[in-house]
Each structure stands twice: as C-alpha cells, then as structure tokens.
From Swiss-Prot:
Name of the protein this chain belongs to: Histone H3
Species, as recorded: Cryptococcus neoformans var. neoformans serotype D (strain JEC21 / ATCC MYA-565) (Filobasidiella neoformans)
Residues bearing PTM N6-methyllysine: 5, 10, 15, 19, 24, 28, 39, 82
CDD domains recorded: HFD_H3 (cd22911)
Stated role: Core component of nucleosome. Nucleosomes wrap and compact DNA into chromatin, limiting DNA accessibility to the cellular machineries which require DNA as a template. Histones thereby play a central role in transcription regulation, DNA repair, DNA replication and chromosomal stability. DNA accessibility is regulated via a complex set of post-translational modifications of histones, also called histone code, and nucleosome remodeling.
This protein's encoding gene: HHT1
Modified residues (N6-acetyllysine): 10, 15, 19, 24, 28, 39, 59, 67
SUPFAM superfamilies: Histone-fold
GO CC, any one term: nucleosome
Amino acid sequence: MARTKQTARKSTGGKAPRKQLATKAARKQAPSQVSGGVKKPHRYRPGTVALREIRRYQKSTELLIRKLPFQRLVREIAQDFKTDLRFQSSAIGALQEASEAYLVSLFEDTNLAAIHAKRVTIQPKDLQLARRLRGERS
C-alpha cells in the first residue's frame, strides 16, 4: 500500500480540562489583577500577514520602489559613465518599470528554486541558481 502524508487536524472533542488546585488558580490570576486587566494587543498568526501582503501586491500594478530614491540611484550609476548627464522623467520611469519587472521575475524564479529544495524560505543560493539558469552568471 502506498504511503500518504499525514496532516495535522484540530480536535473537535476529547477530554475536558482538569480543574486546577486553588493555589495554582490564585497564582495565575494574581498578576492579571495587579496590572489592572490590561488586554494584550491582537496579533495575527505567523504567516497570515505575509499571505495578505502577497495577495495585495499581486493585485496591484503601482511601482513598489519610491521614485526619488530610484532616480538618485540611476544618477549615481550614470556618473561612472559620464558626468553631467540629464534624464527625461519618462526615461527614468521606463528604467524603473524595467528594473521592477526584472526583480519580480528574478524573485519568482528564486522562489521556485527554494520550493524545489523543499523549503519555503528563499536563500542566497536560490538567487544564485536562478541567475545561473538564466545565463546571467556563470
């Protein structure tokens, strides 16, 4: 018979929790009464916010890198080739569109490399593999 993966399931029934001894109950309730019943802030489970952000950014079409920092980066890189270069705003916009499209595509390939290695976390070696498979780096 073939093996199948077991998945964890939440229990719907089972034993009721045991009653605590009076001293344990008093010890557990004492700190909460001293602090004045301050409620802890709500926290989502790990991964929930990440999945929400993934869905949000996959729906959106706006640029993710801020315009001015990207413009400064382009001008800084261009200084190495020629001083006093001028750029049309549409040229910097086109560079930014192309750069973001390239980065998104590269991270998609990097994620596939991590998944292939049976991981969910991308690592530098995944990025190196993705670039090598594309022929960008030997």
